[in-house]
Amino acid sequence: KALITMFKNAGFNAIRVPITWYPHMEAKFTTSPWNPETDPIGTQIQAAWMQRVHEVVDYVISKGMYCIINVHHDTGTSNTHWLIADETNYAQEHERFEAVWAQIANEFRDYDEHLLFEGYNEMLDANNSWSYASSENAGKYSSTAASAAYNAINSYAQSFVNAVRATGGNNAQRNLIVNTYAACCGMGTWNSHLQDPLKQMQLPTDNASGHLIFEVHSYPSLNNGLNSAKSSIDQMMAAVEAHLASKGAPVIFGEWGVPDDENENDCTNKNADMQAFVRYFVEQAKTRGFGTFYWMGLSDGNHRTVPEFNQPDLVEAIVKGYYGNDGYTGVTPVSTAPQMANGRLYDLQGRRVTHPRKGLYVSNGRLVSR
């Protein structure tokens, strides 16, 4: 709870909580390493685990922050992933996936708009292809295999929306987040298929108009210098704008930073570039109306138990990238219509608001509440 408070006081107003569910779904673990195909999990989430999730969500929301919860390490490349961007996998697992989300949604059906659901994290095809579907296909790229993977992603996204909406309550209009294939962002020009995950992603059908969000992840490299990283950011964000945001839903970068192999030394050897990089990323995202969630490293490992920021320079750069050179100066109450009418208000994605409802907004570089 102190960790959440630290982030709130620094100027962050939303936290994405990655959650692993499979060990808490009637898992027997009779094989080592565990293989979900031969030792399947059940569908019922353990009450104790759901209570722990509930506890962490309440930590975030009690601070007036927004909270995203998801199905996280049940996807990816490890042997524990039971959700795969594959049509056969979808046929076998979609009912379990829907049951998981029905339980989560029912648990939190009375929570207000401060809680958002993200359907799945980085779902890959059967060959664990990153960057775009079928990139790791044996022999060569297969358009048929890629198409099947994109179809599966869109099917899982639709199942997620359907399962949550069916639970009613505040879930009928809860903001729901769907990720592209592998949460790919279309960054790079080294292959003609890099933007396919953006182009092939569909906006799910939803009875609640305006309550869906797309998510991508981005880890530009600093190995070729700051200017190269900035060019990659510009190219990538233009692609996201053209091929994803244009489909009628806002976009968030649910994870971003630099690749893992650079993290150890970058903050020491490339400190100035790192600060400029993170500030530029946030500034460009805000200009386009994209939300940003930096992945992990600002307070990691043992630093979380203190708690303290192990990369305070990056925290300052990120906050200034959003709020301006004065940084975060706290929340200023806004209580009357004339006050709001005298200054422009923007939501937390940087979009102009002319008829604000109760919530948090940005005015003249300051966070304000109504």
Question: Which residues does each predicted region cover?
Answer:
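Acidic carboxylate-rich catalytic motifs and surrounding loops in phosphoryl-/glycosyl-chemistry enzymes
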Residues: Y294-D300
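C-terminal tail/sorting-segment detector
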Residues: L360-R370
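Active-site mouth of glycoside hydrolases
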Residues: K1-N191
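Residue-level detector of functionally pivotal "anchor" positions at catalytic/ligand-binding pockets or at interdomain
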Residues: G327-Q349
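Extracellular glycoside hydrolase catalytic/binding regions
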Residues: A99-L116, Y120-F290, T305-K320, G324
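Hydrophobic, well-ordered secondary-structure elements that form the walls
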Residues: T292, G350
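Short, exposed beta-strand-loop hairpins at the edges of beta-sheets
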Residues: G301, P307-F309, V362-S363
